[in-house]
Each structure stands twice: as C-alpha cells, then as structure tokens.
Swiss-Prot record:
InterPro entries: CCA_bact (IPR012006), NT_sf (IPR043519), PolA_pol_head_dom (IPR002646), PolyA_RNA-bd (IPR032828), tRNA_CCA-adding_enzyme (IPR050124)
Summary of the function given for this chain in its UniProt record: Catalyzes the addition and repair of the essential 3'-terminal CCA sequence in tRNAs without using a nucleic acid template. Adds these three nucleotides in the order of C, C, and A to the tRNA nucleotide-73, using CTP and ATP as substrates and producing inorganic pyrophosphate. tRNA 3'-terminal CCA addition is required both for tRNA processing and repair. Also involved in tRNA surveillance by mediating tandem CCA addition to generate a CCACCA at the 3' terminus of unstable tRNAs. While stable tRNAs receive only 3'-terminal CCA, unstable tRNAs are marked with CCACCA and rapidly degraded.
Record-level GO BP terms: RNA repair; tRNA 3'-terminal CCA addition
Record-listed E.C. numbers: 2.7.7.72, 3.1.3.-, 3.1.4.-
Residues engaged in binding ATP: G8, R11, R91, R137, R140
Similarity comment: Belongs to the tRNA nucleotidyltransferase/poly(A) polymerase family. Bacterial CCA-adding enzyme type 1 subfamily.
SUPFAM superfamilies: Nucleotidyltransferase, Poly A polymerase C-terminal region-like
Cofactors that this protein relies on: Mg(2+); Ni(2+)
Quaternary structure (record): Monomer. Can also form homodimers and oligomers.
Listed name of the protein: Multifunctional CCA protein
Catalyses which reaction(s): a tRNA precursor + 2 CTP + ATP = a tRNA with a 3' CCA end + 3 diphosphate; a tRNA with a 3' CCA end + 2 CTP + ATP = a tRNA with a 3' CCACCA end + 3 diphosphate
Species: Pseudomonas putida (strain ATCC 47054 / DSM 6125 / CFBP 8728 / NCIMB 11950 / KT2440)
Chain segments annotated as coiled-coil in the UniProt record: none
Domain-level remarks: Comprises two domains: an N-terminal domain containing the nucleotidyltransferase activity and a C-terminal HD domain associated with both phosphodiesterase and phosphatase activities.
C-alpha cells in the first residue's frame, strides 16, 4: 500500500499558496485492507474512505471509462493493480495530475510542474473532452490563477470548444452548473471565468442572455476588487439585463433565493437608483417600500453596493446617490408608528397613515 497527496494540495504547495484541503490517494490496496486498517467507507460511486483519526478522505486508485452522456456518464474501476500513473491520467489538468509521497517526493508523469512554471492550464489527455463539467472547472481555474499570469493552453481551449459544440453541456444539471459558477464568482478575478466561457462557446450554451462585454464584466470586476459577497457579485453580473432575462437565468440555474432577489430587484430598480437625486418623494417612498427597508435593511444596502460597483465599472469616481438614499431610508425608518396606534388606527387605515407620515418625512429630508 502506497499513500500520496494528490491534486490541489501538491499544486498549491508548489505555487507557494496556502493548502487547505488535502486529497489522499491509495495505490495497491483493496477495500478489505482499508476496512481492516479502520478506514470508514463513504464513497457511493467508487471506493472512498475516511481516515480513522483525521477524518480526511482517502480514495483508492482507479481508472474510468466513458459510458454515457454528461459529467456523470462514467464507469469506474478500482483495484490494487491500478498504478499511480493510470489514476493521474484521468485528471483534468496537468497541474492537478501530480502526486507527493510521504517523503516529499513529487511524481509528475504529465509535466504539470513545467506547466506551472509556464503558467499554462493544459489538459492531461484527450479524455478531457469526455467530461463537460471540465469546461467550467478550467474556466474557474483561469479566474483563480489569473493574478499569477495563468492562461488556458490553446489546445485545451480547442477541446473546450469541441465540448461546447457537442451539446454535452446541456447534460449538466442546474445544481452542478451553479456550484461551479458560484465558486467562480468568489474568485479574485471572476470576470476571467466568463471571458473563457465566451472564448470557447460555452457562455452561449449555458448563459445565452449574458453579454461578456466589458461594461457588464466591469461591474463584477469592481465587486470582486472590493471583496463583495456572492449576491452582490451575481447582481453585478446580471445588471443591465431586462427583468425577464434575469428571471430566466435565475430559474434555469436555481440560484439561491438571496441571489435571485437582489438580481431581480437590481434589474427592476437600477435606473431609479441612478436617478435618485431627481426622484420626487413619492417615487423615493415607492423604491424604499419595494425593498422593504424597514424589515430588510441589508438587502437595500446590498442594492446600493451593486449600484456603486456598476458606476465604478462605468468609470465613475463616486456614487453620491448611495448616501442620499441611505439618508432617505433613515428618514423613513425614523417615523414612529406608536402615535398612530394610540390614535386608534388599525389595519388598512394604519398602513395608509403610516405611508403618509413617511412621505412627509421624505419631503422634509429633500428640503434639507
């Protein structure tokens, strides 16, 4: 039995980056040997075990063969006679196809170290084209390592175009697609992810509503530069699309509710946000009510952040509308409902009276 660190742990150590999760590979062992050594089986599709003390995952070396459509259409074979090289060749990129033994010796049968030095994302073998999910994974790695100067190798981009043209991307489930998009959005340069997808034809297959033009991606780039959360980044990406298109994208990818809500509200209200300084008090009140700023102030704050990131992406140095709208929200929230309740108002009458008082507060705010 031989145990190796594989994949990202080896790659990131060689790049001098922090290593968080470690994937372990076991060569030359049987399921029975693993169980006898106290490992607990957890793999549903192929033999994966949890270490009895650390709880880390250890996978038996395996080969795979394409047996159906999509990223799940593979038959796996795990046995003690599967070699380290046979296991590594099934991996996506050469930089992910290195192994390190317990003595620290690195095994690099597919020249991953050379590609690290050349800053290239290159596929290991032609079998790369059998898994459509790899198109998204490579684009995500391009976004992650763009600050280090990495790019997708020309021959790998050609294979990604082949996958995009084959229709195999349509076999990806919404959940798997969103998982990759979500992870890509949180990278340092998420705009690179969408540029790579555009370059290989995958964006047209997965997100035909999206234009990868600089104006759209500039807002996302600003959001990433300012370390904004996922929902803000998603709304920045979709801003500028008509609400019907935003709704279609949200539903097709099954984005989380928080992301869907902010993207939809941004699509519906971005123009009002930009025109805030000229809006009458009635329109201001309507905008605040639409965001339910009284009960959900953070959602409105996230909207203002999207507006600011979009403005910065368009070349604006500041966004004075944000502070103006924050002041308006504070003025409306400051209205005390207690006197209205004490006056005996209830139900619809109370709601109308409260609305009227908030309108007066906004008018006073505008007068300064």
């Amino acid at each position: 039995m031989h145990i190796y660190k594989v994949g990202g742990a080896v790659r990131d150590r060689l790049l001098g980056r922090p290593v968080s999760d470690i994937d372990w590979l076991v060569v030359g062992a049987t399921v029975e040997e693993m169980l006898a050594n106290g490992y607990r089986p957890v793999g549903a599709d192929f033999p994966v075990f949890l270490h009895p003390k650390t709880g880390e995952e250890y996978a038996l070396a395996r080969t795979e063969r394409k047996s159906g459509r999509g990223y799940g259409g593979f038959t796996f074979h795990a046995s003690p006679d599967v070699t380290l090289e046979e296991d590594l060749i099934r991996r996506d990129l050469t930089i992910n196809a290195m192994a390190e033994d317990e003595a620290g010796t690195v095994y690099d049968p597919y020249q991953g170290k050379n590609d690290l030095d050349q800053r290239l994302l290159r596929h290991v073998s032609p079998a790369f084209a059998e898994d459509p999910l790899r198109v998204l994974r490579v684009a995500r790695f391009a976004a992650r390592y763009a600050p280090l100067g990495f790019r997708v190798a020309d021959e790998t981009l050609a294979l990604m175009r082949q996958i995009s043209a084959s229709g195999e991307l349509q076999a990806l489930t919404a959940e798997r697609s969103w998982k990759e998009i979500e992870r890509a959005l949180m990278e340092v340069q998420p705009q690179v992810f969408f540029k790579v997808l555009s370059a290989c034809g995958a964006l047209q297959e997965l997100l035909p509503e999206l234009d990868d033009g600089s104006r759209t991606l500039a807002a996302l780039e600003q959001a990433a530069a300012h370390e904004q959360p996922l929902n803000v980044r998603w709304a920045c990406l979709l801003r500028g699309l008509p609400p019907t298109s935003i709704k279609a994208v949200n539903q097709r990818l099954k984005a989380p509710r928080e992301c869907q809500e902010l993207a939809m509200l941004t699509g519906e209200c971005l123009a009002q946000g930009n025109q805030a300084l000229e809006l009458p008090a009635t329109a201001l009140l309507e905008l605040l009510q639409k965001f339910d700023v009284y009960r959900r102030p953070q959602r409105f704050e996230d909207f203002l952040t999207v507006c600011e990131m979009a403005a910065r992406g368009d070349g604006e140095q500041g966004y004075p509308q944000a502070d103006y709208l924050r002041g308006a929200a504070a003025a409306a929230r400051a209205v005390d409902v207690k006197p209205l309740v004490q006056a005996g108002l209830t139900g619809q009458a109370l709601g109308e009276a409260l609305k009227g008082e908030r309108l007066k507060a906004l008018e006073a705010y505008q007068r300064g």
